[in-house]
């Protein structure tokens, strides 16, 4: 069944790709500077001045954004691309599948490319591959996953772009499965947060991104264990940047992309996603993300409403919000606004009249 689903996904992605116009080269302006747009909301808590070009802090359950600095501006994602590679992979494979490496993957085993030193003909499980993809950021594994699932790398890339469109990404185009430099490979902080948010709905995705350490056992062509440890400082307890409640994420870096970082944190049943793009150093990206998480936890109160939650700036009362409701598909969807800014949503099933049964003949005779 999983194999049939995978083939259908490939055919659908190829069909969509044929119908879409060719993508033009992205006009990524690396010299542009952006303001913190959420600071312009009257009465909104002032957000931190991060050093990364762009950044966003999103509530995972609803996608509500509490902090936004150029979040819709295109930037090169580098290896945080692999979050989408992981999502498409877990949706179209099983963890016990056998992946045989070909020249497609092994050509990425070079001194200047992150890899796990695979060889042509080597066999790993999909579980091994997915952990190497996220923990080691292995480019050889990314390419091989793409070919294994898509039949060709390009077919898998088409699946990535189709999935991005389905999720609601509007400033993203993928040209490969690894994040290696390509002028036509770009995304935005908001889009990457949306992709990570979608992934968190999948149990296998959550397991892989939430694993800081993994051992690949000896294979048919490698007699040694491969011991993997997270590259994400905010996820590593021994790191000075470790953040309590971190549930994983992904690092990335190239010359053009600078340092990119996706991080998830859960505290008190509240999960936030922070994304920073084009940081100057990984340490600065970690400090930017930490500042955004601290800002959210210190300045907002998660308040329950009928059918959902809103995030109130501390000191703001629920009755000061504006509510806008509409009925769709048997539900009442309500948006809660702080001024004109959406800070929460709720969904409640509409009440229906329960028909009263007519008395039966037996009941009438009793």
State what each model feature region is.
Residues 169-170, 181-186, 190-366:
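Domain-terminus/edge residues, biased toward the C-terminal soluble/receptor-binding domains
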Residues 2-25:
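Sec-dependent N-terminal signal peptides of Gram-positive bacterial secreted proteins and lipoproteins
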Residues 25-190, 194-203:
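Active-site-adjacent loops and short helices of periplasmic peptidoglycan-processing enzymes
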Residues 4-7, 83, 267:
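Hydrophobic alpha-helical segments, especially transmembrane helices
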Residues 21-25, 62, 106, 272, ...:
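Generic "edge-of-domain/loop-turn" microfeature
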Residues 17-18, 94, 292, 300:
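Hydrophobic alpha-helical membrane context
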């Amino acid at each position: 069944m999983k194999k049939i689903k995978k083939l259908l996904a490939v055919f659908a992605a190829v069909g969509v790709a044929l119908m879409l116009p060719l993508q033009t080269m992205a006009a990524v302006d690396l010299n542009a500077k952006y303001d913190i747009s959420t600071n312009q909301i009257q009465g909104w808590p002032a957000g931190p001045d991060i050093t990364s070009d762009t950044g966003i802090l999103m509530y995972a359950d609803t996608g509500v954004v509490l902090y936004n600095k150029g979040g819709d501006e295109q930037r090169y994602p580098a290896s945080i691309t692999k979050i989408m590679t992981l999502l498409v992979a877990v949706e179209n494979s099983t963890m016990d599948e056998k992946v045989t490496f070909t020249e497609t993957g092994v050509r990425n085993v070079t001194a200047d490319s992150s890899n796990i030193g695979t060889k042509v003909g080597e066999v790993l499980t999909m579980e091994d591959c997915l952990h190497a993809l996220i923990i080691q950021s292995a480019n050889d594994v990314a390419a091989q996953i793409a070919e294994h699932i898509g039949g060709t790398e390009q077919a898998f890339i088409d699946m990535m772009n189709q999935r991005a469109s389905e999720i609601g990404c509007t400033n993203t185009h993928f040209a490969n499965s690894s994040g290696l430099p390509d002028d036509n490979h770009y995304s935005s902080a908001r889009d990457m947060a949306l992709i990570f948010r979608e992934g968190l709905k999948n149990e296998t995705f959550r397991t892989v991104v939430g694993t800081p350490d993994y051992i690949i056992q000896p294979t048919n062509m490698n007699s040694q264990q491969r011991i993997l440890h997270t590259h994400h400082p905010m996820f590593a307890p021994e790191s000075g940047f470790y953040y309590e409640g971190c549930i994983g994420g992904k690092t990335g870096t190239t010359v053009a992309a600078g340092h990119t970082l996706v991080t998830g944190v859960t505290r008190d049943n509240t999960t936030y996603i922070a994304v920073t793009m084009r940081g100057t150093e990984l340490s600065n990206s970690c400090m930017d993300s930490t500042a955004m998480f601290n800002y959210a936890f210190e300045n907002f109160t998660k308040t329950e409403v009928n059918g959902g939650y809103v995030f109130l700036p501390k000191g703001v009362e629920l009755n000061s919000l504006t509510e806008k409701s509409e009925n769709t598909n048997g539900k009442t969807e309500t948006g809660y606004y702080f001024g004109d800014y959406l800070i929460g949503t709720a969904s409640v099933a509409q009440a229906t009249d329960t028909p009263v049964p007519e008395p039966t003949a037996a009941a009438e005779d009793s």
